Amino acid sequence: MRSSARISIHQMTALMEKMPSYGDYRSDEQAAEAERTFRRALGVMLKECGDHLLNVADQRSQALNAEEEGKVDALIDRIGMIFRRLDREGDVCLVGNCDNTIHELEEIDLRLILVIEKATEMVRNLESGTQTNHWFQTEAERLSRDLSSFSEMTEERNYLLGLGWESEFSWPGRESL
């Protein structure tokens, strides 16, 4: 694997610097702003993944078959679902025991960063000399699973932060915290 296919240290550092420091929140406004900042940073990286997929699909449009084009569309749809979940606004109100919830949020945030790093690497591999049909047979399915996992973790964060819509109802498998 080429090093150019990896996420840059600058990108990773910038994302990690935007991770919320939940224990340091002193006001609702501070919590909401920290959330917006982190969510935007995740969204920027997801947008880059989506843009890269679309650019490669456009550049290789004649080489892609209908199934491969369908996979690109499905991946873009998954990214769109994540955007909707990242776009949740509202008052941050941690559910359950604050210490336990903060610990869970920190774990989820780290997993989100690892997934976005892996997703970025997979998307960039599509252009880095990997044969297109091989990428669509192996990497596209892995990327789809990773994006699905990312989406679920995003919704779990929403629940833990008390941020609306699906989160207004109990998170599956969580009767109480």
Feature map (PLM): residue ranges:
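Leu/Val/Ala/Ile-rich N-terminal alpha-helices, chiefly Sec-type signal peptides and the beginnings
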Residues: M1-S61
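Residue-level signal for alpha-helical context at structural boundaries
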Residues: E33, T37, R60, C93, ...
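Alpha-helix boundary/capping detector
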Residues: F38-M45, E68, T138, F169
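Charged linear interaction tracts used for macromolecular binding and regulation
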Residues: D51-S149
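Preference for long, well-ordered alpha-helical segments
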Residues: T132-L177
